């Protein structure tokens, strides 16, 4: 067996929003497979706490403050990444996202602008800025962290629109940038047990509504998302591009009221 197919040794990665939840798990998984990782986050205190913890473990992780919804800060971020990694980048994980759970008639123009800027605009322009670095690496990979609500209807139209757009962006970039040896895929998790979601998981009514139609009958764990994301970046996944892969415990394929 060629073990290099299952290694990220010598590769570089940028993970946006890497200091908590799914992003944090992705960082640890990428490092575990040998990658050098740079993260960005808007929370300086949390970022520094994570970096201290990782450095204590001997992980090669660096970080910088960035509000990805800000164009100047996105440009500065990519300049930093270029300087750190010798103008080359193998892996870009567009992980940053937020949600505002409102139905259409209750959503405001401010809600729309905020979600579009953070969830979609940031991923679009960071990918654009990263293109020269990804191309220069000779083996570029982009993974968008989407959501099941970008595949099937959910409880927030704006949030779902941003995530559905990420899925389409993965398809478009997969075709447009294939000649530059850049792959692009989207990972669409179902409800994931992060600190932000934990309060909802403790609500029995919410949990019943979410998991009564989920064959595996539970929330996804951040490390489970991280495993899929990392696999897509491995040489072993070199023929996978333009895909949206749901990691949802069977939720999107359950066509009847299944009770786990």
UniProtKB/Swiss-Prot annotation:
InterPro entries: NAD(P)-bd_dom_sf, Sc_DH/Rdtase_CS, SDR_fam, TR. The active site is at 159 (proton acceptor). Substrate binds at residue 147. GO terms for cellular component: extracellular region. Belongs to the short-chain dehydrogenases/reductases (SDR) family. SDR65C subfamily. Keywords: NADP, Oxidoreductase. This is Tropinone reductase homolog At1g07450. Its EC number is 1.1.1.-. It is an enzyme of class 1 (oxidoreductase). NADP(+) binds at residues 14-38. The keyword Zinc-finger does not apply. The keyword tRNA processing does not apply.
């Amino acid at each position: 067996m060629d073990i290099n197919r299952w290694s990220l040794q010598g590769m570089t990665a940028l993970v946006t929003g890497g200091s908590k939840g799914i992003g944090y798990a992705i960082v640890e998984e990428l490092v575990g497979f040998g990658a050098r990782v740079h993260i960005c986050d808007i929370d300086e205190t949390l970022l520094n706490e994570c970096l201290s913890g990782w450095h204590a473990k001997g992980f090669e992780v660096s970080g910088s403050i960035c509000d990805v919804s800000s164009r100047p800060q996105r440009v500065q971020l990519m300049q930093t990444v270029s300087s750190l990694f010798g103008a080359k980048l193998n892996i870009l994980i567009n992980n940053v996202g937020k949600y505002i759970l409102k139905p259409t008639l209750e959503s405001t123009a401010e809600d729309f602008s905020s979600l579009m800027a953070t969830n979609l605009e940031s991923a679009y322009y960071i990918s654009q800025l990263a293109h020269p670095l990804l191309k220069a690496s000779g083996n570029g990979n982009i993974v968008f962290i989407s959501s099941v609500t970008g595949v099937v209807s959910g409880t927030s139209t704006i949030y779902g629109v941003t995530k559905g757009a990420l899925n389409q962006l993965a398809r478009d970039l997969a075709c447009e940038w294939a000649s530059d040896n850049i792959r692009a895929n989207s990972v669409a998790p179902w409800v994931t047990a992060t600190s932000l979601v934990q309060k909802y998981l403790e609500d029995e009514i919410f949990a019943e509504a979410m998991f009564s139609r989920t064959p595996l009958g539970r929330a996804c764990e951040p490390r489970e998302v991280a495993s899929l994301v990392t696999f897509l970046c491995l040489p072993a996944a070199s023929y996978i591009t333009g895909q949206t892969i749901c990691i949802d415990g069977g939720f999107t394929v359950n066509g009847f009221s299944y009770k786990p």
